[in-house]
Amino acid sequence: MACTKTLQQSQPISAGATTTTTAVAPAGGHSGSTECDLECLVCREPYSCPRLPKLLACQHAFCAICLKLLLCVQDNTWSITCPLCRKVTAVPGGLICSLRDHEAVVGQLAQPCTEVSLCPQGLVDPADLAAGHPSLVGEDGQDEVSANHVAARRLAAHLLLLALLIILIGPFIYPGVLRWVLTFIIALALLMSTLFCCLPSTRGSCWPSSRTLFCREQKHSHISSIA
């Protein structure tokens, strides 16, 4: 009698355990299916705008890229064979875009994502950058001065060539007064370009600017502090 009572008590416990396991199993299966619904079953890539989920006639969904690879001609029609159930789906004109989208997955893809705000803390004011690195400003100034010297020399060469042409061709084309006026104007422009070309370069080469001296002093102090 004791054995029969023990068996009768153990049967409800085991039945409750089975019901618990069966109740828990669908929940786990549903979460796994939800994760699988968000990625293609062929390439295992998550759905996105280039990989839109497309439904076949068998209601199985795959990404558009995999369906393009599975597209073939059967009986003179474009069709796709489902990789899961092997059911054939006709594709009008061979256009994957003609297939219906998986609305549930597309709705999840259309949900707005949290935007990450970037704070450009590394950006500083150009004035602060110039104050922190005066050597860069000095180099830029020297480059501008050298470019101005080159432009002035080219202008002087062009004006000299123009003056020579006027002196050579002027007696045959222009009268005396106009010829001398043009010659005077070109000579004055040539003199000004020569002054702009020569004087700043000699001054800059002989006398260094205060900014250059300040940069050198900072370099020497920086080297001494490191030593």
Curated annotation (Swiss-Prot):
Gene3D superfamilies: Zinc/RING finger domain, C3HC4 (zinc finger). Polyubiquitinated. 'Lys-29'-linked autoubiquitination leads to proteasomal degradation. Its EC number is 2.3.2.27. Pathway: Protein modification; protein ubiquitination. The keyword Zinc-finger applies. Changing H60W: Loss of ability to decrease SESN2 protein. It is a multi-pass membrane protein. GO terms for biological process: intrinsic apoptotic signaling pathway in response to endoplasmic reticulum stress; proteasome-mediated ubiquitin-dependent protein catabolic process; protein autoubiquitination; protein K29-linked ubiquitination; protein K63-linked ubiquitination; protein localization to mitochondrion; regulation of autophagosome assembly. It comes from the Eukaryota. A zinc finger (RING-type) spans 40-86. The chain crosses the membrane at residues 158-178, 180-200. Keywords: Endoplasmic reticulum, Membrane, Metal-binding, Transferase, Transmembrane, Transmembrane helix, Ubl conjugation, Ubl conjugation pathway, Zinc, Zinc-finger. The keyword Endoplasmic reticulum applies. It is found in: Endoplasmic reticulum membrane. GO terms for cellular component: endoplasmic reticulum; endoplasmic reticulum membrane. It catalyses: S-ubiquitinyl-[E2 ubiquitin-conjugating enzyme]-L-cysteine + [acceptor protein]-L-lysine = [E2 ubiquitin-conjugating enzyme]-L-cysteine + N(6)-ubiquitinyl-[acceptor protein]-L-lysine. Its main location: endoplasmic reticulum. GO terms for molecular function: ubiquitin protein ligase activity; ubiquitin protein ligase binding; ubiquitin-protein transferase activity; zinc ion binding. InterPro entries: RING_finger_E3_ubiq-ligases (IPR051435), Znf_RING (IPR001841), Znf_RING/FYVE/PHD (IPR013083), Znf_RING_CS (IPR017907). Interacts with BNIP1. E3 ubiquitin protein ligase that is part of an apoptotic signaling pathway activated by endoplasmic reticulum stress. Stimulates the expression of proteins specific of the unfolded protein response (UPR), ubiquitinates BNIP1 and regulates its localization to the mitochondrion and induces calcium release from the endoplasmic reticulum that ultimately leads to cell apoptosis. Plays a role in the maintenance of intestinal homeostasis and clearance of enteric pathogens. The RING-type domain is required for ubiquitination. This is E3 ubiquitin-protein ligase RNF186. The gene is RNF186.
